[in-house]
Curated annotation (Swiss-Prot):
InterPro entries: ATP_synth_OSCP/delta_N_sf (IPR026015), ATPase_OSCP/d_CS (IPR020781), ATPase_OSCP/dsu (IPR000711). F(1)F(0) ATP synthase produces ATP from ADP in the presence of a proton or sodium gradient. F-type ATPases consist of two structural domains, F(1) containing the extramembraneous catalytic core and F(0) containing the membrane proton channel, linked together by a central stalk and a peripheral stalk. During catalysis, ATP synthesis in the catalytic domain of F(1) is coupled via a rotary mechanism of the central stalk subunits to proton translocation. This is ATP synthase subunit delta. F-type ATPases have 2 components, F(1) - the catalytic core - and F(0) - the membrane proton channel. F(1) has five subunits: alpha(3), beta(3), gamma(1), delta(1), epsilon(1). F(0) has three main subunits: a(1), b(2) and c(10-14). The alpha and beta chains form an alternating ring which encloses part of the gamma chain. F(1) is attached to F(0) by a central stalk formed by the gamma and epsilon chains, while a peripheral stalk is formed by the delta and b chains. One of its GO terms (cellular component) is plasma membrane. The keyword Protease does not apply. It is found in: Cell inner membrane. Its main location: membrane. Keywords: ATP synthesis, Cell inner membrane, Cell membrane, CF(1), Hydrogen ion transport, Ion transport, Membrane, Transport. GO terms for molecular function: proton-transporting ATP synthase activity, rotational mechanism.
Length: 183
């Protein structure tokens, strides 16, 4: 996700509407917006069309109407996307969706992160790590687990904009720097 300020504002606006209607609507808006944004992300031609000023708003709205129908978007998300078309912001849908997802996670008390290991962890070990992190954070954590043999050993935990690098590769790098400095 980029630092697109307009995308953040639009996401907050849709989120505020959803908050007034309840958590179920927040989830529904998130699902609908995600389906539309995914279609834009997966189709470079669609993204180019939405960015291209040579196409009129009416032409973009016609394509958008078909997209919204295929995605099963409700009235509120459809109106929201039509507003984006009027303002020339349809190309920002993926960024708007990403920020909306962050707002929704914060509302639900969910933290998303990634745990990178050198080898694939067994399910029991993954569950134990997740449970321990949830206990320390005091919140529910959604972890994606990935394998990167280049870290040699240990783990790298990425949560939000924070990274905890407890990998063997990082430790060896620190040792190398200390040797170079003569410590």
């Amino acid at each position: 996700m980029t630092g697109n300020i307009a995308a953040r504002r639009y996401a907050r606006a849709l989120f505020a509407i959803g908050q007034k209607q309840g958590l179920a609507e927040l989830d529904a808006f998130g699902s609908e917006l995600s389906a539309v944004a995914k279609a834009v992300e997966e189709s470079p031609a669609l993204a180019r069309l939405f960015r291209n000023p040579l196409f009129s708003i009416e032409e973009k709205r016609a394509v958008l109407a078909k997209l919204l129908q295929a995605a099963g978007a409700g009235q509120t998300v459809s109106n929201f996307c039509n507003l984006l078309a009027d303002k020339g912001r349809l190309a920002d849908l993926p960024d708007i969706n990403a920020f909306y997802s962050l707002l929704l996670d914060a509302e639900k008390g969910i933290i998303r992160g990634e745990l990178v290991t050198a080898i694939k962890l067994a399910k029991a070990k993954r569950d134990a790590v997740k449970e321990q992190l949830e206990k320390q954070a005091g919140q529910k954590i959604e972890l994606n687990f990935s394998v990167d043999k280049d870290i040699l050993g240990g783990v790298v935990l990425k949560v939000g904009d924070r990274v905890l690098d407890a990998s063997l590769r990082a430790q060896l790098g620190i040792l190398k720097d200390n040797i170079k400095r003569g410590e």
